[in-house]
Swiss-Prot record:
Residues reported to bind substrate: M35, R77, L115, E156
GO CC annotation: cytosol
Organism field: Salmonella typhimurium (strain LT2 / SGSC1412 / ATCC 700720)
Record EC number: 4.1.3.40
Keyword terms, alphabetized: Cytoplasm, Lyase, Pyruvate, Ubiquinone biosynthesis
Signal peptide: none
Subcellular location field: Cytoplasm
Pathway of action: Cofactor biosynthesis; ubiquinone biosynthesis
Protein name (database record): Chorismate pyruvate-lyase
Length: 165
């Protein structure tokens, strides 16, 4: 199963540098904290619609080439993050199999738990970068995060109902 928003997410084109945008947009796009928490601060009940969770080969995560270690298998999680049942964000997480050792194994078992609820409670979380992307009228971003120094790639597309717009 797939979702049209995930097709748009994969079509994001990234800026080489942070573009000159309205402060309101940058506030959302460069947020270092949990997007789940940010949505909850809007007074909304946040839920996850799980689209896909599975191990995949390198050919299904080409966007991670050069950003993550080259491995034969990656854990792929694709979701819609909803606020009061309305999709606000499409998310795609790519995790190298080598990252999934020790406590990070929990990344395979999040189910309908928002990724941010796990990541941002970890004292070992660091972020290497945030890149801003755009596809037609929609904004997105991607970040390489590390848990205990082990990388994962998180890509987010802000959907039209999102307060970013």
């Amino acid at each position: 199963m797939s979702h049209p928003a995930l097709t748009q997410l994969r079509a994001l084109r990234y800026f080489d540098a942070i573009p000159a945008l309205e402060p309101h947009l940058l506030d959302w796009l460069l947020l270092e904290d949990s997007m789940t928490k940010r949505f909850e601060q809007q007074g909304k009940r946040v839920s996850v619609t799980l689209i896909r969770e599975a191990f995949v080969g390198q050919s299904e995560v080409e966007e991670a080439s050069g950003l993550l270690p080259s491995e034969s298998r990656y854990w792929l999680r694709e979701i819609l993050l909803c606020a009061d049942g309305e999709p606000w964000l499409a998310g795609r997480t790519v995790v190298p199999e080598s990252t999934l050792c020790g406590p990070e194994q929990v990344l395979q078992h999040l189910g309908k738990t928002p990724l941010g609820r796990y990541l941002f409670t970890s004292s070992t979380l660091t972020r290497d970068f945030i890149e801003i992307g755009r596809d037609a009228t929609l904004w997105g971003r991607r970040s390489r995060l590390r848990l205990s120094g082990k990388p994962l790639l998180l890509t987010e597309l802000f959907l039209p109902a999102s307060p970013l717009y």
